[in-house]
């Protein structure tokens, strides 16, 4: 029934009006009920720090205390632009709000890999209704002094807007990653790096290997949508390689509870030492 109503509205409304109606319905069905319920329901992520037994103090404590059931302003902003970071299947925005909430007025440099291609022929696409650049526009709105950069393998969706610039990158190609980081705009390093590209272990580690050195002191590197069946592989990689290779960084693997998604609603969050 809901699908039929959506299709009828899509046919009769302009794209912008249809987007506004969908956002209003989302607020009524998801945001407001969850906002009320979050006063009574507390759901926190399972957080594993690396190396095993390492206590990273306030960083891990902060992550373990986030109520991922509670919607936030970031949830609304990202959803308004068409991002899936906080609209049901993923609920990362509560965690990001806790991590970045005090940085609202800072002149941040942010890079997100994966613009959200709607090219159905490419792996990890967002479907025909996907909105490329949705998350980038969300970051721009949330941080009014930030410069936001994006990268994607789909050259057809690259774009440039006010405080947003995007580049080509194939995250399985080490040369392409080096070429990305050779761009003049990216020479100062990043305060926040998000990998929301090709969601495979090999792709994630490939981009991480070529990008972590470009994270500024105190910066945060995030890998989204880690699949549940790769958690143990990540445990081993973090314990035996990355935590030793980067001893001044804090590593936290988060399994984020979500009744709508029990397969890939997991994050790796890395904080660079000062």
Model-based region annotation:
Residues 1-194, 198-222, 227-274:
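A short alpha-helical cap/connector motif
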């Amino acid at each position: 029934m809901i699908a039929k109503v959506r299709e009828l509205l899509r046919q009769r409304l302009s794209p912008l009006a249809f987007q506004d109606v969908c956002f209003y319905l989302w607020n009524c069905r998801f945001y407001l009920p969850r906002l009320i319920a979050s006063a009574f329901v507390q759901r926190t992520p399972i957080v594993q720090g690396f190396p095993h037994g390492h206590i990273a103090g306030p960083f891990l404590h902060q992550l373990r205390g986030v109520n991922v059931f509670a919607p936030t302003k970031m949830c609304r902003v990202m959803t308004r632009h068409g991002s899936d970071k906080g609209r049901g299947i993923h609920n990362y925005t509560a965690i990001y709000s806790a991590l970045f909430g005090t940085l609202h007025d800072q002149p941040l440099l942010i890079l997100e890999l994966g613009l959200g291609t709607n090219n159905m022929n490419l792996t990890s696409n967002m479907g025909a209704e996907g909105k490329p650049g949705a998350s980038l526009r969300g970051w721009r709105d949330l941080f009014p002094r930030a410069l936001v950069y994006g990268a994607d393998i789909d050259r057809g969706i690259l774009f440039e807007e006010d405080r947003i610039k995007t580049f080509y990158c194939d995250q399985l190609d080490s040369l392409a990653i080096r070429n990305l980081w050779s761009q003049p705009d990216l020479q100062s390093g990043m305060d926040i790096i998000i990998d929301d590209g090709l969601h495979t272990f090999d792709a994630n580690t490939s981009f991480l290997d070529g990008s972590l050195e470009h994270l500024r002191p105190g910066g945060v590197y995030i890998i989204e949508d880690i699949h549940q069946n790769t958690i143990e592989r990540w445990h081993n990689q973090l314990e035996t390689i990355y935590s030793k290779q980067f001893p001044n960084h804090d590593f936290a693997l988060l399994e984020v509870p979500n009744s709508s998604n029990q397969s890939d609603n997991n994050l790796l969050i890395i904080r660079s030492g000062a």
